[in-house]
Amino acid sequence: METSKTAAESGVSFEIIFVGRSNVGKSSLLRELFGAKVRVGKRPGVTLRPAHVQVSDLLITDMPGFGFMSGVKDRKQDIVKDKTVHYIEENAERIKLGVLVIDSPAFPQIVDRWDSKDQIPIDVEMFDFLREVGIDTIIAANKMDKVKESEYGSLLDEIAIRLGLESPWQNWKHIIAPISAKKGDIKALKGLLRDRLHEMKRDDLFKYV
């Protein structure tokens, strides 16, 4: 795989973007999925620009983490969010898939915290935004290895509800993929990605996913 400088220069026609809060494991997931050598920051929010990896006409994009960024002022955080939205709007036609990566154990509490302030959590806002601009979106519910097996189903139900999806979560297996990137357990996500590629008649990309 080659790191892409700009999609325009590379003749890209098919893009998959990965979005999520800082430190939810996006870069680790990309490495596990594609073997991509994407820089992984030790502190939340180290990545401030999109990181691209290209193979054939497929572009894989790791968008900057939104939300808390260590050592980054609030104003700059807003700029990163605005640039992310602008990037998605500008390239919506070629962005065929969006993967929203979340920290599963923390997600319900994060959403509830923002709800208590009468504010829309940025994760939920991003999920809704991607779908509004017509981008098929998958939820990569990461860090499930930190969840007790007995609480697995109830947590995924809570995640679905907070995303505006009625429980039980099993009704949304075509959208929600429980994974653990660090443990290499990403089978559910790979399955959903391949399902989407097949629907788009891009089985030729299976060898990269």
Swiss-Prot record:
Its cofactor is Mg(2+). Mg(2+) binds at residues 27, 47. GTP binds at residues 20-27, 45-49, 62-65, 142-145, 179-181. It holds the Pfam family MMR_HSR1. Keywords: Cell cycle, Cell division, GTP-binding, Magnesium, Metal-binding, Nucleotide-binding, Septation. GO terms for biological process: cell division. Residues 12-203 form the EngB-type G domain. GO terms for molecular function: GTP binding; metal ion binding. Transmembrane segments: none annotated. Signal peptide: none annotated. PANTHER family: ENGB-TYPE G DOMAIN-CONTAINING PROTEIN, MSS1/TRME-RELATED GTP-BINDING PROTEIN. Necessary for normal cell division and for the maintenance of normal septation. Belongs to the TRAFAC class TrmE-Era-EngA-EngB-Septin-like GTPase superfamily. EngB GTPase family. This is Probable GTP-binding protein EngB. It comes from Methanosarcina barkeri (strain Fusaro / DSM 804).
